[in-house]
Amino acid sequence: SVVVTSSTAGLYGYPNRAPYAAAKWAVIGLMKTLAMELGPFGIRANAICPGSVEGPRMEGVLEREAAAKGMTRDQVYDGYASGTALGRFVEADDIANMAVFLGSDAARLVSGQVIAVDGFTINPDPKV
Protein backbone atom coordinates (compact mmCIF):
# COMPACT_ATOMS: atom_id res chain seq x y z
CA SER A 1 0.00 0.00 0.00
CA VAL A 2 1.18 3.50 -0.87
CA VAL A 3 0.10 6.31 1.45
CA VAL A 4 1.10 9.86 0.55
CA THR A 5 0.51 13.06 2.47
CA SER A 6 -0.90 16.12 0.79
CA SER A 7 -2.76 18.89 2.62
CA THR A 8 -6.18 20.44 2.84
CA ALA A 9 -4.57 23.07 0.60
CA GLY A 10 -4.72 20.33 -2.05
CA LEU A 11 -8.48 20.14 -1.55
CA TYR A 12 -9.53 23.77 -1.18
CA GLY A 13 -6.61 25.96 -2.21
CA TYR A 14 -5.58 28.84 0.04
CA PRO A 15 -5.29 32.55 -0.77
CA ASN A 16 -1.70 33.85 -0.88
CA ARG A 17 -0.28 30.30 -0.91
CA ALA A 18 -0.54 29.37 -4.59
CA PRO A 19 2.78 27.49 -4.90
CA TYR A 20 2.05 25.40 -1.80
CA ALA A 21 -1.52 24.62 -2.89
CA ALA A 22 -0.36 23.71 -6.41
CA ALA A 23 2.23 21.29 -5.04
CA LYS A 24 -0.38 19.60 -2.83
CA TRP A 25 -2.84 19.29 -5.73
CA ALA A 26 -0.02 17.62 -7.68
CA VAL A 27 0.50 15.05 -4.91
CA ILE A 28 -3.18 14.11 -5.15
CA GLY A 29 -2.93 13.74 -8.94
CA LEU A 30 0.15 11.56 -8.56
CA MET A 31 -1.61 9.34 -6.01
CA LYS A 32 -4.69 8.88 -8.21
CA THR A 33 -2.46 7.92 -11.16
CA LEU A 34 -0.53 5.47 -8.98
CA ALA A 35 -3.81 3.92 -7.81
CA MET A 36 -4.78 3.28 -11.44
CA GLU A 37 -1.37 2.02 -12.53
CA LEU A 38 -0.59 -0.13 -9.48
CA GLY A 39 -4.08 -1.47 -8.79
CA PRO A 40 -3.72 -4.38 -11.24
CA PHE A 41 -0.74 -5.52 -9.15
CA GLY A 42 -2.77 -5.45 -5.92
CA ILE A 43 -1.12 -2.26 -4.70
CA ARG A 44 -3.39 0.41 -3.26
CA ALA A 45 -2.61 4.15 -3.18
CA ASN A 46 -4.30 6.78 -1.02
CA ALA A 47 -3.63 10.31 0.20
CA ILE A 48 -4.01 11.82 3.64
CA CYS A 49 -4.75 15.56 3.69
CA PRO A 50 -4.09 16.98 7.14
CA GLY A 51 -5.44 20.33 8.20
CA SER A 52 -3.50 22.62 10.55
CA VAL A 53 -1.13 20.38 12.51
CA GLU A 54 0.08 21.17 16.03
CA GLY A 55 3.86 21.55 16.02
CA PRO A 56 6.83 23.82 15.34
CA ARG A 57 5.85 24.69 11.75
CA MET A 58 2.37 25.83 12.76
CA GLU A 59 3.75 27.71 15.77
CA GLY A 60 5.86 29.74 13.36
CA VAL A 61 2.81 30.46 11.20
CA LEU A 62 0.81 31.56 14.25
CA GLU A 63 3.58 33.83 15.54
CA ARG A 64 4.21 35.46 12.14
CA GLU A 65 0.53 36.00 11.48
CA ALA A 66 -0.04 37.40 14.98
CA ALA A 67 2.82 39.88 14.53
CA ALA A 68 1.59 40.92 11.07
CA LYS A 69 -1.97 41.47 12.29
CA GLY A 70 -1.20 42.97 15.71
CA MET A 71 -2.89 40.07 17.47
CA THR A 72 -1.85 37.52 20.05
CA ARG A 73 -0.78 34.04 19.05
CA ASP A 74 -3.84 32.64 20.88
CA GLN A 75 -6.23 34.88 18.94
CA VAL A 76 -4.79 33.62 15.67
CA TYR A 77 -4.89 30.00 16.92
CA ASP A 78 -8.55 30.38 17.91
CA GLY A 79 -9.33 31.82 14.47
CA TYR A 80 -7.82 28.84 12.70
CA ALA A 81 -9.35 26.31 15.11
CA SER A 82 -12.79 27.89 14.68
CA GLY A 83 -12.44 27.17 10.95
CA THR A 84 -13.01 23.47 11.72
CA ALA A 85 -16.22 21.82 12.87
CA LEU A 86 -14.37 20.12 15.74
CA GLY A 87 -12.66 23.36 16.79
CA ARG A 88 -9.10 22.09 17.17
CA PHE A 89 -5.87 21.44 15.33
CA VAL A 90 -4.70 18.05 14.09
CA GLU A 91 -2.11 16.15 16.12
CA ALA A 92 0.57 13.92 14.59
CA ASP A 93 -1.11 10.83 16.05
CA ASP A 94 -4.30 11.62 14.12
CA ILE A 95 -2.37 11.40 10.86
CA ALA A 96 -0.39 8.33 11.95
CA ASN A 97 -3.56 6.47 12.93
CA MET A 98 -5.06 7.08 9.49
CA ALA A 99 -1.84 5.93 7.78
CA VAL A 100 -1.85 2.72 9.83
CA PHE A 101 -5.49 2.09 8.88
CA LEU A 102 -4.85 2.73 5.18
CA GLY A 103 -1.91 0.35 5.23
CA SER A 104 -3.88 -2.39 6.97
CA ASP A 105 -6.06 -5.19 5.64
CA ALA A 106 -9.06 -3.35 7.09
CA ALA A 107 -8.66 -0.93 4.15
CA ARG A 108 -8.10 -3.64 1.53
CA LEU A 109 -10.63 -2.11 -0.88
CA VAL A 110 -9.75 1.53 -0.20
CA SER A 111 -7.69 2.90 -3.09
CA GLY A 112 -7.47 6.16 -4.99
CA GLN A 113 -9.00 8.03 -2.08
CA VAL A 114 -8.23 11.41 -0.58
CA ILE A 115 -8.86 11.37 3.17
CA ALA A 116 -9.00 14.70 5.01
CA VAL A 117 -7.78 14.46 8.60
CA ASP A 118 -8.71 17.97 9.58
CA GLY A 119 -11.65 18.05 12.00
CA PHE A 120 -13.82 18.94 8.98
CA THR A 121 -12.59 22.24 7.63
CA ILE A 122 -15.56 24.54 7.23
CA ASN A 123 -13.53 27.69 6.48
CA PRO A 124 -10.05 27.10 5.05
CA ASP A 125 -9.12 30.80 5.29
CA PRO A 126 -10.58 32.17 8.53
CA LYS A 127 -10.45 35.92 8.89
CA VAL A 128 -8.69 36.29 12.22
Which residues make up each language-model segment?
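Residue(s) in the substrate-gating loop at a strand-loop-helix junction
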Residues: 7
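Short C-terminal tail/terminal secondary-structure segment
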Residues: 12, 111-128
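Active-site loop immediately N-terminal to the catalytic Tyr-X3-Lys motif
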Residues: 12-18, 40-41, 87, 105
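Active-site helix of classical SDR
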Residues: 23, 31
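Short, flexible catalytic-loop segment of classical short-chain dehydrogenase/reductase
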Residues: 28, 50-60, 64, 68
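A short hydrophobic alpha-helix cap/turn motif
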Residues: 38-40, 53, 103
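Short, small/polar-rich loop/turn modules that mediate ligand/substrate recognition or access, typified
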Residues: 39, 44, 110-112
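C-terminal helical subdomain
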Residues: 47, 55, 71-106, 110, ...
